[in-house]
Amino acid sequence: MIRYIFLGLAILIGVPVMLLSKTISTPLGAMLLAANDDGLAGAWFCDQRHLPDRTAFSEVTQQRWLDHAQRELLAYFDGRLRQFTTPRSAVLGTAFQRAVWQQLCELGHGTTTSYGALAAALGRPTAVRAVAGAVGRNPWSIIVPCHRVVGSQGQLTGYAGGLPRKQALLTLEQALPGVTQSG
């Protein structure tokens, strides 16, 4: 089902934006995908933290980036996709958050890193908490692989979609914490 969603000023930069959205089924639960003409604006598990307000939805027809993201997510879960190509629309987040999210895209399939290593890679080694906050607000679950960030000792730490999902994603990628850590 595809719907319109209106995201308020509280989570957007500048002005309100009308996005198309679609709810899809995945092996780890339903996901809400949202897009505009520029690309995918978000991908959230329907029961995760930081899910946008869904009260202003109204149904529409297909949308190319939603369909593209759906195909890629299903291929990922089938083990046929290791890197996403769906363009992302930068309607969410601050400049710092967007920099963190872009850095997350550098993490290879089957690897993990720590919040500290991620902060260092951004040239902000003392900004570990700010980096962790940005990781937690990532609007593109799975597509921007925040699930690949673990604690400094390789332990599973927060994930907006829940730790069982994070564990399942790392297992799917065969990247159990502490085994293939890259930082």
Where are these regions (language model features)?
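Basic nucleic-acid-binding alpha-helical/helix-turn surface characteristic of O6-alkylguanine DNA
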Residues: 5-126, 175-183
